[in-house]
Curated annotation (Swiss-Prot):
Pfam family for this entry, one: CHZ
Domain of life: Eukaryota
Region (Interaction with the histone H2A-H2B complex): 429-572
SMART domains: CHZ (SM01082)
Protein name, per record: HIRA-interacting protein 3
Composition bias, Basic residues: 117-129
Gene: Hirip3
Post-translational modification: Phosphorylated by CK2.
Species for this entry: Mus musculus
Biased composition (Polar residues): 347-378, 556-566
Ranges annotated as biased composition (Low complexity): 97-113, 379-388, 413-432
CC annotations in GO: nucleolus; nucleoplasm; nucleus
Annotated region (Disordered), positions in chain: 60-469, 546-601
Length: 601
């Protein structure tokens, strides 16, 4: 083979295999040719010849690059004329959107798309097999097949994405058509002009797919017209229905929104005042909003009125609030009547509280302080004026974390007996400034009384800390051994649990416990100690012990330090009678008398 023909063949094959011809240079072609030939360098004549070949073949390949893109379609039509000769199926990728939109009434809109995909895949496989078998150069044909496969896979991916969009649009249209009432069957025979159809197709699909959609729309004229007409009719009906449904929804949404805002505001204000009721200004404000006609505000006013009484009325107010938010605006009159009744009840309660206050002013300061402290914890208290509300909130905030347990106890025990006193105290705080001062004193006393139990709590905590489970277990073992110890003296110097445990273990060892202590061992040790005590009580040698603290009689006889107390006792007895010494009598049967006499002398 001539070197010129070999160069020409190489350049053509290289340009066919190259994916991007714009990046090809003379140096790249020369390097590839040297690798192909297996040489180190080229002669100047060969370089010039290769340069001319590149300049000749490169424009040709660039001109043919556009035709290479349509090569897979050409192969498909050429190799498998039966499944791919139909132009409609060939261009299904572009026409699938108009076809699916024009036939929404079909039960399965993805059926033809899946069939066409399978036919495309089979055509592509056959074409690739033919190309691989027919070509002579293995390397070049492999590259061509790879390029064709990439292009076809990209096309198929685009087609699948478009078909997925089409199926989603079709499902949306079906869901809209299910919820709306369709018109009469006579509308199926009508046809919409081609311009309207073209306009809708442009809105649904992109401008790049316009021509294919128009061709498909001409073929599917009648079905597309019917579908468009139904969609337009449904689009005309939907705004009217939405307008009709939006008005009651907007009203109910407003009511629910206001209810939520009020509820959230109350929940924010309640933690500061855990049990305190509403102030007069807030009650008047809530009562003034009743006449607005909004059902949620009326229910809220009912709830606020209900909190003035006992805890049961607050639950009723919450139930009325929920009913007011769910119901429509027709229940406004009933809500106004309920709120008026609540207001009248509040006024009567305040008047009765003032009367009771005039009668209860002569009572002692202790009863007033107790009533004021109880009034802060009761849910029926109305509160003082707006100026004192901030300070009372701060006091209640400081007391909230300390006396929650005491408040619960006081509520459960004094709820029935102290309602009248709390109301009278709260009404007196509204009428005159003196009770407010007394209430402040009562609150300060209650806060001091609340702060008083803290040391007891600390002592209890320290006791709980001393009574560690292991410490308590060892104490129980010592008690089971029959020994009773003063643990305050024994464990007074210990500052940790380990030190206490070591002291208690040493005490058990001193009692005779060996190994790991247990209740059975302790019971056995107790029996042994009791038996040993009985034996010691019966021993004669233990009548008078020479050990122990010094007696007073030793001070009278300074020379008798070396002598035992028994000898001194006998000496004193023998000194009275100057007789010859006889054998000492056995005083064992009289040891109690002798020991008591010796102690008393």
């Amino acid at each position: 083979m001539a070197p010129g023909d070999e160069m020409r063949k190489f350049t053509r094959s290289f340009f066919r295999a190259c994916p991007d011809l714009s990046s090809v240079t003379h140096a790249i072609v020369r390097q590839k040719f040297l690798i192909h030939v297996g040489r180190d360098h080229l002669e100047p004549e060969e370089k010039q010849a290769l340069k001319r070949l590149v300049e000749e073949e490169l424009p040709k390949m660039q001109a043919d690059a556009g035709t290479r893109e349509g090569k897979p379609d050409f192969i498909k039509v050429k190799r498998s004329p039966a499944p791919c000769s139909d132009p409609k199926k060939k261009r299904f990728r572009f026409n699938s959107e108009s076809e699916s939109s024009s036939s929404p009434s079909s039960p399965d809109g993805s059926g033809p798309s899946t069939k066409n995909r399978t036919t495309k895949k089979t055509c592509l496989r056959r074409a690739l097999k033919k190309a691989v078998e027919s070509t002579d150069e293995d390397h070049q044909t492999d590259l061509d097949a790879k390029m064709g496969l990439e292009e076809s896979s990209e096309g198929e991916a685009e087609g699948s994405v478009r078909s997925g969009k089409v199926t989603e649009e079709e499902e949306d249209m079906k869901q809209e058509q299910k919820g709306q009432v369709r018109k009469q069957a006579g509308a199926k025979d009508k046809q919409v002009p081609l311009k309207a159809d073209r306009k809708q197709v442009r809105e649904e699909s992109g401008s790049s797919e316009e021509e294919a959609v128009l061709q498909r729309a001409k073929v599917e004229g009648s079905t597309g017209a019917n579908c468009q007409e139904e969609s337009e009719e449904s689009g005309e009906e939907s705004p009217a229905k939405k307008k009709e449904l939006s008005e009651p929804r907007s009203r109910s949404n407003r009511a629910e929104r206001t209810a939520r805002e009020r509820k959230s505001y109350k929940q924010k204000s309640r933690p500061g005042r855990p049990t305190g009721g509403l102030r007069d200004s807030e009650a008047e404000k809530e009562g003034g909003t009743v006449g607005s006609g909004d059902s949620s505000e009326e229910g809220e006013a009912e709830k606020e009125g209900g909190t003035v009484g006992s805890g049961d009325s607050s639950e009723k107010g919450e139930a009325e609030k929920e009913e007011g938010t769910v119901g429509s605006g027709d229940s406004s009159e009933e809500g106004e009547e309920h709120s008026v009744k609540r207001k009248s009840k509040v006024r009567t309660q305040t008047e009765s509280g003032r009367r009771q206050n005039t009668s209860s002013r002569d009572d002692s300061n202790s009863t007033q302080e107790q009533a004021a402290a109880q009034g802060t914890t009761k849910s029926g208290s109305l509160g003082s004026s707006n100026g004192d509300s901030d300070t009372e909130r701060e006091v209640s905030d400081s007391q909230a974390g300390q006396n929650t347990k005491e408040e619960r106890k006081s509520r459960s025990s004094n709820k029935s007996s102290k309602n009248g006193q709390a109301r009278s105290c709260s009404s007196s705080s509204d009428s005159s400034p003196e009770p407010t001062g007394q209430k402040g004193k009562a609150r300060s006393s209650s806060s001091s009384s609340d702060s008083g139990p803290e040391p007891t709590g600390r002592k209890a905590a320290s006791r709980c800390g001393e009574d560690h489970p292991a410490v308590a277990r060892l104490k129980r073992y010592i008690r089971a051994c029959g020994a009773h110890r003063n643990y305050k003296k024994l464990l007074g110097s210990c500052s940790s649990h380990k030190a206490r445990l070591s002291v208690l273990r040493a005490e058990l060892e001193a009692l005779g416990m060996k190994g790991n202590p247990s209740l059975e061992k302790c019971r056995a040790l107790k029996l042994q100690r009791e038996e040993a005590a009985e034996v010691a009580a019966l021993d004669v040698a233990n009548i008078i012990s020479s050990t122990g603290r010094p007696r007073r009689r030793n001070a009278w006889n300074p020379s008798g330090e070396g002598t035992s107390p028994g000898e001194t006792y006998r000496r004193t007895l023998d000194s009275e009678e100057e007789q010859p010494r006889q054998a000492p009598p056995d005083w064992s049967h009289m040891r109690d008398i002798i020991s008591s006499d010796g102690d008393s002398s």
